[in-house]
């Protein structure tokens, strides 16, 4: 179950990326049971993913607590650019931790923090990764499936409200 803080960060990430030429989707399930081993061998979910009209794919992993950050849930950094989004106080707790710094370096991850004024701020830029055509295709298909899932939920909600 998502905490209120996680929901807030997710919504603010959506608001910050909701621009002309950028499409976003939350909880993107990567691949299917047949393709999960293509990238990592594990079932992957990206908390929030955007795709630009130029085909650039950005992945955002949202963590709202130390337990969340250290949980067994995978951090899926599969896009051209990848960001870890977390509250500023959590970032301050882990900013000098060796395990955290190694994770940032190994994946060239950017850091976005939620400040006390309820604004997101880019603290650390990420390096752009080159993705193979196969990886890009898998991510685009996953994005489309997840967006269709969300559209289906809206259709169901509309029909429920019309009755």
Predicted regions and their residues:
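Non-catalytic C-terminal interaction segments of nucleic acid-processing enzymes
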Residues: 1-21, 33, 95-163
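A short acidic/basic microdomain associated with nuclease active sites
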Residues: 18-40
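Anionic group-transfer/hydrolysis microenvironments
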Residues: 29, 49, 63
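Surface-exposed, flexible loop/turn segments at secondary-structure boundaries
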Residues: 32, 56, 67-68, 90, ...
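Active-site beta-strand-loop-beta-strand hairpin of nuclease catalytic cores
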Residues: 41-59, 68, 74-77
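Residue-level detector of short, conserved catalytic/binding motifs and their immediate flanks
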Residues: 46, 80, 109
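Short, hydrophobic beta-strand segments that form beta-sheet elements in well-ordered domains
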Residues: 58-64, 82-86, 110-113
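Short, charged, amphipathic alpha-helix that recurs within catalytic cores of restriction-modification
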Residues: 65-104
